[in-house]
């Protein structure tokens, strides 16, 4: 599901820049990868990314979402030497930060997983109703 953090008087750009995100991949085969990403290490700052995405050249009257990505790219071999890393079905992937919480997903085939019917309208309706 989505992970959204809105800026307000308790959380601003400097807070976002100082975040460290932990990533963990755990497999049924005993595989465990961990990594830490420092948002401050991104190659382009938030203001630079926003200025490239918004202006007369790209107009979004209703706003937009800025996805900054992650610095984590596993290079360890998983199944055989020289083949690199690939997810297996059942892998549990978690991205977490003490301030933001955690996003946890299990790798599966889309056609075999429950339908993702919780969309943006329901999310914002729940936010408006004070549900979490």
Spans of features found by a protein language model:
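Extended hydrophobic-aromatic, low-complexity segments
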Residues: 32-35, 58, 104-106
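Generic secondary-structure signature for well-ordered alpha-helical cores
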Residues: 28, 55-58, 98
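A conserved acidic, glycine/proline-rich C-terminal tail/linker
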Residues: 48-87
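Charged, cofactor-coupling segments
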Residues: 2-3, 8, 76-132
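Active-site proximal loops enriched in glycine and acidic residues that flank catalytic Cys/His/Asp
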Residues: 25-27, 36, 64, 69-70, ...
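Glycine-enriched loop-and-adjacent helix/strand subsegments that border the catalytic/binding cleft
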Residues: 1-50, 120-131
